[in-house]
């Protein structure tokens, strides 16, 4: 078998191949034959000059083949490798990565003898390849490649029995298998990066064009273009070198760690750790000068607990409490996603730890006992590094579309070149060299030299704008996706609502409908549960943890001490000592503690009302009605319960089975919390709704609470229906929040129902939909998803994508990881202050001259506006003694510094640092607000329209150039060297200025066209080209009437004449008009007048045309090789140019009105996908 499907997030497919011997390669032997034929047959039979042309063509073709082996991995495999069916015959493999994970690569296949633990079993052969710092192993049993396995899916019982690597043989085997715990990335050099850039297809093509222009005597233009190319490529290489050097500085901490090997504790460097090692990890005591200790690898906490700062991975500064697996069911398998509160992730810092000396294996330094799970690039930090590392390549917008569009233009260029070739060969006196040169120039004119640079700038400008707003992106290709988003999904808690919870009181203990706020009237047992059933912890003498739990403690007026003891601030109540915690788990929807009050042991439990209900001995009569009443009001409700435990030892309490602790409970009331909606949630979501986006809420909260909040933030506006099970049966029905409207559930009527109602479903309903294969029929029409588990959030996003929705998911980056990764655009919000106020933002967009670049602060600081713009023109006191010239020099130095730093180069993406990015999501926003969603969508739309206008302008310039270089070239019309240089500079300046247009502050209801291939763009191109062609043809024909009847030789050197002059002037005006007409300003970007540099460049271009056409400065026209125009011809040119502009402008505006961008018709795709699924089920 020559091909293997790998699946997964990194590699999709692997093809086996074998390298051919040098003489049998397709880039060697065919050309050896061709060169021999040229030497023995062609040279003797034709003129030497024609033979040299043939040799030049053959050499160019050979060089092109060699270059294609660098550009295309598929072509390289075809030329230099042969396919093999057996893995034993292969020595390399072609790796096809998963979509959006980079480009294909050919990597060597390694065969080696694998060491085994037992000498008697002999050595086994291991076959593997390394791809992007990951190893893939071939399994002969399965006949497939899979990722190198790490011990991450064993049972808790297995980990608790771990004693590390017991022998030197096992250590050697593990070292050979997994390697050292390092981030090994070779240091690149400037020369290597520059060589890579110079081997890019666009760059080679541009250098080839420069060579052709030199042969056609365009020396100034060629040298200018070549200088510009090398300047930009060297800037790019320098910027990438800095980025990669910064990434290489990230190292696994080389601190020493106590490791249990061969039956004893030994001190080893963190870089020597291996998966399976048992280690002692903790923060050194302050007496020994200990600092925050960095965790060197991903490890599972066996014994002891730790408080960890995970900001380097999640960007979230709130410390996380890590607990041991002691007390968990021994047969339960580890899932790092689900059991992350037991896992210490590499790169994070231990703030404090609590050892447990009751375990059989004692740590020598008082640390926590842990077992290493993953090392090196397989750790969470390593994965994030890989994401950042392999997204530092050059980024472009719509690369496949740009290729197809250029191919479309090449067709026209080839037709024009063919016309010139046929006509030229009819004249036997024509120089074949000049003829072939002319044809080559026509075909190469399709792609201007600045195109790749401008496409990169389109994305990178957006990246920089987002970074200045505190939004970091690790996957730049997703920015254009943001412009295509039509569905925005939001988590509720901590995203739409504030983290500052308000404790409203306790309900459900009396017949009173309002929650009891007087804590003296609340049973002491209920207060004890609220005071102790939590996961709060002291870090550096400060209480940290869930804001809801802190609000409850404050609301009941109890205190909590560092020794895990809770006691009332007033009165003589008993203290509550926590003995064992069972932390909150999203799949269980509850948490519990075992406490001791005086000499009595009790279990305190809190969780979702419907979850606790199933575990109560007696359910109060008004239980359901009470919690539903509070949730309808938008409150968050937690059910409280307890049970008495028999007398026991402390060790027995800690070993109790969680399920036994959390069963047969006695109800103790409902804790009711108000969850205030963030001030800007409703305005931001209303703006999104008004800008043609559908809104969806996905939350783990209760359905009634979710629907109440959804109504306040404009997600639902129609009457709401909630899908639920009817009574104890298995039938489902739609019920309104007040239970006055009830409609039987039928999956076939969902679409009709969704037209008049907003639908809400819960996690249990999703399980039903999965069981009945109705997911695709129902989920696309739902507005609110409540009580959903993290895995269900992922399923919801996958379903929306399957029916053709452009999805954005906004969450907090902890419970929403799967959904954030699945969405086209995932935005993780971190709780930091906003970097800019709305007023600052609007000022920023109004005036570029008054705005200075925002400095990037460390992750812990707020990003503030700074620089010249904030001083409002006043000279700082320390600079008042400087002269005007010195001040000017300082300003110039500051500008140069800005250009030279790592963010001043719009050509390269800004470096995303660890701590800025979240491993949860492609976009990380350091805001306690959903406002970044609008910023990301604005930048996405801006990138889309900028790319679209670039291609339109490119298309029109290409079609006009193809005509000028073909039909007019045959008539002897040419451009001078200076003329071509000025034209090139003008085009580059225009492209640069349009790519830096900033998006408008307000999102428009109008949508950008998602693709280059649309009716609007095609009609716009054809219509404008027809007008341009008419203007060009009539102008040249008019000029010919004033020309003396002289024969102009097409191959003759350039000399000024009237037709050449008119041709240049018309080309200049067409260029200015093309940029002015096709600039996409409102409603997405700044208008032409607001984009000052572009506006002034247009005025300068139009003014330049008027000046040279009016012949105001004769010396200027002489230097440009332009002859004087007759008065009548001059007036006609100016009138025709004005008419051409008005007609093109009107045509463009008419098409924008007639063919606006629209949301894709996802319902058609939903029906098609559902019908296809039905067919598969029948088969």
UniProtKB/Swiss-Prot annotation:
One GO term (biological process): meristem maintenance
The enzyme's E.C. designation: 7.2.2.-
Protein keywords: ATP-binding, Endoplasmic reticulum, Magnesium, Manganese, Membrane, Metal-binding, Nucleotide-binding, Translocase, Transmembrane, Transmembrane helix, Transport
GO molecular function: ATP binding; ATP hydrolysis activity; metal ion binding; P-type transmembrane transporter activity
SUPFAM superfamilies: Calcium ATPase, transduction domain A, Calcium ATPase, transmembrane domain M, HAD-like, Metal cation-transporting ATPase, ATP-binding domain N
Disruption phenotype: Imbalances in cation homeostasis and severe reduction in fertility. Increased inhibition of primary root growth in low inorganic phosphate conditions.
Main location: endoplasmic reticulum
Transport found in the keyword field: yes
Keyword Transferase listed: no
Pfam family, one: Cation_ATPase
Chain residue ranges for the region called Disordered: 833-880
Function text: Mediates manganese transport into the endoplasmic reticulum. The ATPase activity is required for cellular manganese homeostasis. Plays an important role in pollen and root development through its impact on protein secretion and transport processes. Functions together with LPR1 and LPR2 in a common pathway that adjusts root meristem activity to phosphate availability. Under phosphate limitation, restricts SHR movement in root meristem and is required for maintaining SCR expression in the root meristem stem-cell niche as well as for proximal meristem activity.
Protein name: Probable manganese-transporting ATPase PDR2
């Amino acid at each position: 078998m020559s091909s293997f499907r790998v699946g997964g997030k990194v590699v999709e497919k692997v093809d086996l191949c074998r390298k051919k011997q040098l003489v049998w390669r397709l880039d060697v032997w065919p050309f050896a034959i061709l060169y021999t034929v040229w030497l023995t047959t062609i040279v003797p039979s034709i003129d030497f000059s024609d033979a040299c042309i043939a040799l030049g063509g053959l050499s160019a073709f050979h060089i092109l083949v060699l270059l294609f082996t660098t550009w295309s991995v598929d072509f390289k495999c075809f030329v230099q490798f042969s396919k093999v069916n057996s893995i034993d015959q292969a020595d390399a493999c072609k790796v096809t990565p998963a979509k959006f994970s980079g480009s294909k690569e050919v990597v060597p296949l390694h065969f080696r003898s694998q060491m085994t633990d037992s000498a008697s079993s002999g050595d086994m052969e291991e076959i593997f390849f390394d791809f992007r710092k990951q190893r893939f192993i071939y399994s002969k049993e399965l006949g497939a490649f899979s990722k190198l396995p790490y011990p991450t899916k064993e049972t808790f019982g297995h980990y608790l029995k771990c004693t590390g690597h017991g022998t030197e043989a096992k250590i050697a085997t593990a070292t050979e298998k997994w390697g050292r715990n390092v981030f090994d990335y070779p240091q690149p050099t400037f020369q290597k990066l520059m060589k890579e850039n110079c081997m890019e297809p666009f760059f080679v093509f541009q250098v080839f064009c420069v060579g052709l222009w030199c042969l056609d005597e365009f020396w100034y233009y060629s040298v200018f273009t070549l200088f510009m190319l090398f300047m930009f490529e060297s800037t790019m290489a320098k910027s990438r070198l800095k980025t990669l050097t910064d990434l290489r500085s990230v190292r696994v901490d080389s601190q020493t760690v106590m490791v249990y090997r061969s039956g004893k504790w030994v001190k080893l460097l963190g870089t020597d750790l291996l998966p399976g090692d048992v280690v002692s990890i903790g923060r050194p005591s302050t007496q020994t000068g200990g600092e925050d200790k960095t965790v060197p690898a991903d490890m599972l906490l066996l014994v002891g607990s730790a408080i960890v700062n995970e900001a380097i991975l999640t960007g979230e500064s709130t410390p996380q409490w890590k607990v041991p697996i002691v007390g968990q069911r021994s047969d339960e398998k580890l899932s790092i996603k689900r059991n992350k509160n037991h896992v210490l992730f590499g790169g994070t810092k231990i703030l404090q730890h609590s050892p447990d000396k009751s375990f059989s294996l004692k740590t020598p330094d008082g640390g926590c006992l842990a077992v290493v799970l993953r090392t090196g690039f397989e750790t969470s930090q390593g994965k994030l590094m890989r994401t950042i590392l392999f997204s530092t390549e050059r980024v472009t917008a719509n690369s496949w579309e740009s290729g197809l569009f250029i191919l479309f233009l090449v067709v026209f260029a080839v037709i024009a070149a063919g016309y010139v070739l046929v006509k030229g060969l009819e004249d036997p006196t024509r120089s074949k060299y000049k003829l072939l040169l002319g044809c080559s120039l026509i075909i190469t004119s399709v792609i201007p030299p600045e195109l790749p640079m401008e496409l990169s700038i389109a994305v990178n400008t957006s990246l920089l704008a987002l970074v200045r707003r505190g939004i970091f992106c690790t996957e730049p290709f997703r920015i254009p996706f943001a412009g295509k988003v039509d569905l925005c999904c939001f988590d509720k808690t901590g995203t739409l609502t504030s983290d500052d919870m308000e404790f409203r009181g306790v309900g459900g203990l009396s017949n009173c409908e309002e929650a009891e706020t007087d804590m003296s009237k609340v049973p002491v047992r209920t207060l004890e549960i609220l005071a102790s059933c939590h996961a709060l912890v002291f870090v550096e003498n400060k209480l940290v943890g869930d804001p809801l739990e802190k609000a409850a403690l404050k609301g009941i007026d109890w205190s909590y001490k560092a020794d895990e003891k809770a006691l009332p601030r007033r009165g003589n109540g008993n203290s509550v000592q926590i003995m064992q915690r069972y932390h909150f788990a999203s799949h269980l929807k509850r948490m519990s503690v075992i406490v001791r009050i005086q000499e009595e042991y009790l279990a305190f439990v809190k969780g979702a009302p419907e979850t606790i209900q199933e575990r109560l001995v007696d359910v109060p009569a008004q239980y359901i009605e009470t919690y539903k009443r509070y949730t309808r009001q938008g409150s968050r409700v937690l059910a409280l319960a307890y049970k008495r435990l028999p007398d026991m030892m402390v060790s027995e309490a800690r070993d109790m089975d969680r399920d036994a602790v959390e069963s047969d409970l006695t109800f103790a009331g409902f804790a009711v919390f108000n969850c205030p909606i963030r001030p800007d949630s409703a305005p931001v979501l209303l703006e999104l709704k008004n800008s043609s986006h559908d809104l969806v809420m996905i939350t783990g909260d209760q359905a009634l609470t979710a629907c109440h909040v959804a109504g306040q933030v404009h997600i639902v506006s129609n009457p709401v229906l909630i899908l639920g099970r009817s009574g104890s049966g298995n039938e489902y029905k739609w019920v309104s929040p007040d239970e006055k409207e009830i409609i039987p559930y039928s999956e076939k009527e969902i679409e009709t129902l969704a037209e008049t109602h907003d639908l809400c479903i819960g996690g249990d309903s999703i399980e039903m939909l999965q069981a009945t294969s109705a997911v695709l029929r129902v989920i696309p029409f739902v507005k609110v998803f409540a009580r959903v588990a993290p895995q269900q959030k992922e399923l919801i996003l996958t379903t929306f994508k399957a029916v053709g929705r452009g999805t954005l998911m906004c969450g907090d980056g902890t419970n929403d990881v799967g959904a954030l990764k699945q969405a086209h655009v995932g935005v993780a919000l971190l709780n930091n202050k906003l970097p800019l106020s709305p007023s600052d933002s609007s000022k920023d967009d109004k005036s570029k001259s008054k705005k200075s670049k925002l400095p990037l602060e460390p992750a812990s600081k707020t990003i503030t506006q700074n620089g010249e713009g904030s001083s409002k023109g006043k000279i700082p006191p320390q600079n008042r003694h400087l002269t005007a010239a010195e001040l000017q020099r300082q300003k110039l130095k500051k500008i140069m510094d800005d250009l030279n730093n790592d963010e001043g180069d719009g050509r390269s993406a800004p470096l995303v640092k660890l701590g800025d990015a979240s491993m949860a999501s492609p976009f990380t926003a350091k805001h306690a607000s959903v406002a970044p969603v609008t910023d990301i969508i604005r930048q996405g739309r801006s990138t889309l329209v900028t790319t679209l206008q670039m291609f339109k302008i490119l298309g029109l310039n290409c079609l006009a150039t193809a005509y000028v270089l073909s039909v007019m070239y045959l008539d002897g019309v040419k451009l001078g060297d200076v003329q071509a240089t000025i034209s090139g500079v003008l085009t580059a300046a225009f492209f640069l200025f349009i790519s830096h247009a900033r998006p408008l502050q307000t999102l428009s209801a109008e949508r950008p066209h998602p693709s280059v291939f649309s009716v609007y763009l095609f009609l716009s191109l054809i219509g404008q080209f027809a007008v341009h062609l008419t203007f060009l043809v009539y102008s040249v024909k008019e000029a010919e009437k004033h020309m003396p009847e002289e024969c102009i030789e097409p191959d003759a050197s350039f000399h000024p004449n009237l037709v050449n002059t008119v041709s240049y002037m018309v080309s200049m005006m067409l260029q200015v008009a093309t940029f002015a007409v096709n600039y996409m300003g409102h409603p997405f970007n700044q208008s032409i007048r607001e984009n000052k540099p572009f506006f002034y460049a247009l005025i300068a271009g139009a003014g330049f045309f008027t000046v040279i056409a009016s012949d105001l400065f004769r010396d200027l026209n002489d230097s440009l090789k332009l002859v004087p125009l007759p008065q009548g011809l001059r007036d006609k040119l100016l009138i025709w140019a004005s008419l051409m502009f008005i007609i093109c402008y009107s045509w463009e505006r008419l098409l924008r009105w007639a063919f606006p961008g629209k949301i894709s018709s996802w319902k058609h795709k939903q029906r098609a996908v559902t019908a296809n699924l039905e067919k598969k089920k029948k088969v």
